[in-house]
């Protein structure tokens, strides 16, 4: 399942497409078009949050849940942002962190109903990526004045700095749950 995005122009998109292993199919669209969003969960139970609503740095706090058929707006993030990272395996429990405008360190926990501010990242940054669950996660990369290789792990209560990436990058993709996972791509 993929959703949102940005096309030259610039314009943000609300399209959602699902993949069945062979082909992509257009399904019900997001309620609000955005890019720079974060999301987690399988095809049947996903959540996404934040984003940029106009491709010009207009941070959003909106969240939407996917039930396998359609999106529904749900409780907003406490802090509007885009280019944020996160972790989670379904729409009932997730974690989001970092983001822009001006790099943010905020971390918020999703309990299936609302977002709660919890312990901040040690280093605030945008274009951060992560993987894991809401109680055991990894946050990495990001771009301050230059791409960063910072890595922090979350134990359900606080963040701890750990070994950096070999090469600092931003806008990475990621997958996995701790103790193993991977990050890839990025300029």
Question: Model-derived features: where do they sit?
Answer:
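Polar, enzyme-active/binding microenvironments
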Residues: 1-187
């Amino acid at each position: 399942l993929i959703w949102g995005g940005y096309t030259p122009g610039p314009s943000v998109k609300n399209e959602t497409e699902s993949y069945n292993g062979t082909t992509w199919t257009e399904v019900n669209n997001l309620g609000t078009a955005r890019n720079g969003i974060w999301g987690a969960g399988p095809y049947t139970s996903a959540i996404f949050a934040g984003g940029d609503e106009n491709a010009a740095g207009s941070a959003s706090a909106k969240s939407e849940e996917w039930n396998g058929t359609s999106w529904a707006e749900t409780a907003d993030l406490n802090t509007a942002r885009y280019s944020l990272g996160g972790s989670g395996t379904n729409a009932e429990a997730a974690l989001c962190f970092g983001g822009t405008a001006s790099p943010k360190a905020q971390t918020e926990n999703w309990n299936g109903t609302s977002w709660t501010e919890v312990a901040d990242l040690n280093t605030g940054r945008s274009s951060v990526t992560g993987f894991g669950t809401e109680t055991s996660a990894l946050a990495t990369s990001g771009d301050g004045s230059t791409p960063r290789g910072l890595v922090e792990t979350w134990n359900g209560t606080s963040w701890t700095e750990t070994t950096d990436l070999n090469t600092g990058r931003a806008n990475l993709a990621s997958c996995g749950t701790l103790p193993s996972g991977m990050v890839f791509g990025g300029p």
